[in-house]
Amino acid sequence: MPASAPQNSTTFDSARFLDDYKKTADALGAPYNESIVARTLNSFGNCFNEGTVIWRSTSRPNDKLNYRFYLRDRVDTVALAIKAGYIEESHPMARLVTCWSNLFDGETVQWCDLDPEEGVAKTWIFMKTQRSIDNILDAAEVSDCVRAHRATFHSLGLKLVHFAAVDYHGGTLNIYFTVPGPISEAQAAAYTNLSGCKPPTPDEFADLRKYLPTQRFVFAATIDYTTGKIKRVAFYALNVPGSELPETMNDRLRKFFADAPSYDKQQTKNIAWSYGNGDSKYMKGLGEECEESRAGTFGPDVGGCESFLLLLRL
């Protein structure tokens, strides 16, 4: 069932999801463990039923097909992951997530990125509104080597944060900035330089100018928690309409958008260009599996769930 043929139901169905997952992963040549995928659907209470469920794929051959849920209400998903045995309570990334989640009088929401072989890949922290990068870096569990980027972030205009995330298996943290647009070539080059990567090619920059919002856009940095090294950065194009896709997108990611089922009445696509150490580059795509997104779901600063079906795997 192609993504262009939405069905009537926007309610999550675990049996349907598992069947759709296997078909989509097989079509993409993405590895998975069916029993682990099935177990994750039962490990997080009503999170799949109450949230928006997202597919996530990349342009890299044989890369995994991950899946996510975005929630409206506060749920301790870290505790659920620990209870299920996916992570240890003492894991530095688990402590960091809990620390960030307790900022701003607990006015945050945790989201999860699930891995078809490991169980849990990442936990996201949605800040509900834009927060100062200083608040994020000053959190008790943030390592000093990560805080060392403070002046650099400020000098590049990377001052406001709407989301953060941790990667349990990669040992990295992600910070998602909201920055003014429209993007310029100098701005793009300065941002990719953070990860030691060359500037976007002319074709890539043409796509960035075409698809990134002109008023403001999402830019993310992936940082090693132990060393402080910025390993990767990414630019996000949100709510790409209809069948339109960037010229620089390869066949694998195009197939993902064509084949991944969606049961949402209003389908949206979210696309990221990722630039990493050693000039490693790839693209990411996210699409909704179910639950109709509505503007204002997460507040006016975000503009609805669709504004960050992103993010963002950084």
UniProtKB/Swiss-Prot annotation:
The keyword Nucleotide-binding is annotated on this UniProt entry: no
Matches recorded under InterPro entries: Aro_prenylTrfase (IPR033964), Prenyltransferase_CloQ (IPR020965), PrenylTrfase-like_sf (IPR036239)
Keyword annotations of the record: Prenyltransferase, Transferase
Gene Ontology MF term list: prenyltransferase activity
CDD domains given in the database record: PT-CloQ_NphB
Enzyme nomenclature, EC number: 2.5.1.-
Disulfide bonds: none
Additional free-text comment from the UniProt record: The gene is not located within a recognizable secondary metabolic gene cluster.
Its job: Prenyltransferase that attaches isoprenoid moieties to carbon atoms of aromatic substrates in an enzyme-catalyzed Friedel-Crafts reaction.
Family membership: Belongs to the aromatic prenyltransferase family.
Record's protein name: Aromatic prenyltransferase
UniProt organism field: Arthroderma otae (strain ATCC MYA-4605 / CBS 113480) (Microsporum canis)
Origin organism lineage: Eukaryota, Fungi, Dikarya, Ascomycota, Pezizomycotina
